[in-house]
């Protein structure tokens, strides 16, 4: 199937469901506790990421689509952290705050990329009045091309049938990531996306492909669905529709590091593609490609348009160009096996100008390969203000990747690339400007690993800020 990426900016999607905050505590472990036979983790890094329905909304926003999110939260620090994280990535939150319940939070403790324990903080939202959710759906329906209902059985979708009927009345497709074995409650939905174990919990164990298809088609008929997409892990996914032959899409995953949130990516990309005008078959193809990308990342993750474009064109393993962190680590390892010296620099690179090009060319001359780490849009706004960046992340990375001096381009979400630099550990870390070497983010980690840190001069009188001001003066 030949599929091109749609213009996701035309797509509006509303996600309704169980939102939660995923917390990750990372650190080394080198001893066993004297209190009990358990490892002691010295926590040195803490991350917070939106999870559940919130991760679906993030996946939609990461494609450039208009992403709206409705869910239930408490009135607490977790709710504030969740809202803040989502606002950073342009998700429009419209939460219903419930003062008697805490925001659902899941805490994972990890060491050496291994999850040691997960702690859940939740009470569920059973018994909460669904009317405020109905009202939010009704208000959003005229502005969206798809409704996603993300069910984690925490209470936000207890009245899911009413939500389905609201969408059907407005002729908006409703896509559901189901939970549990009672699919009757999803009757009349446009599409269900159960994984294989969820599917077999309803129809029984399928001995072969023929049984899976026949039982799936019966389920479609019994519950008046327009379609059913069964995600099957390493076996890919299968789309079933009345009157059409089954469509099987083999997995595109190269390596599997973590399946956390992969189902969220599937339904998020699928909904965004549908809302942008793709057919259901094309949308499933894109969702399958996105799943192959996201399982190669650690933790709850999203996929960018460039990663998706690379996946559908088979460029994810080419070894050069725009990459995610896992792909970059593999490329760097291969470069070192060839005895190549790896140089790394970073910046926003909002409006690429002659000063940038000269600086990057000089940085490249200091080694064999040049990595350029680029601030995300959210990071740029925090550093430069709400009117920046002028050019979105994907466009900035494409332009950088086209330069002869640049081998690899990788994005980062934080204000500084210190974590990324510590993970990659380049042979030479380069920064432009009037910094002192010990002021450069990541310098301590590079020195500790035996690497070098160097400061290069920028070309005088040329800057993105000056260019923007000149444009404003000209327009004025």
UniProtKB/Swiss-Prot annotation:
Involved pathway(s): Nucleotide-sugar biosynthesis; ADP-L-glycero-beta-D-manno-heptose biosynthesis; ADP-L-glycero-beta-D-manno-heptose from D-glycero-beta-D-manno-heptose 7-phosphate: step 1/4; Nucleotide-sugar biosynthesis; ADP-L-glycero-beta-D-manno-heptose biosynthesis; ADP-L-glycero-beta-D-manno-heptose from D-glycero-beta-D-manno-heptose 7-phosphate: step 3/4
Catalytic residues, per the record, are: 264
Q: Give the GO terms filed under biological process for this record.
A: ADP-L-glycero-beta-D-manno-heptose biosynthetic process
Name the residues that bind ATP: 195-198
Q: Which domain of life is it from?
A: Bacteria
Enzyme superclass (EC): transferase
Keywords assigned by UniProt, alphabetized: ATP-binding, Carbohydrate metabolism, Kinase, Multifunctional enzyme, Nucleotide-binding, Nucleotidyltransferase, Transferase
Checking PROSITE patterns in the record gives: PFKB_KINASES_1
Q: Which family does it belong to?
A: In the N-terminal section; belongs to the carbohydrate kinase PfkB family. In the C-terminal section; belongs to the cytidylyltransferase family.
Q: Where is this region: Ribokinase?
A: 1-318
Can you say what this protein is called? Bifunctional protein HldE
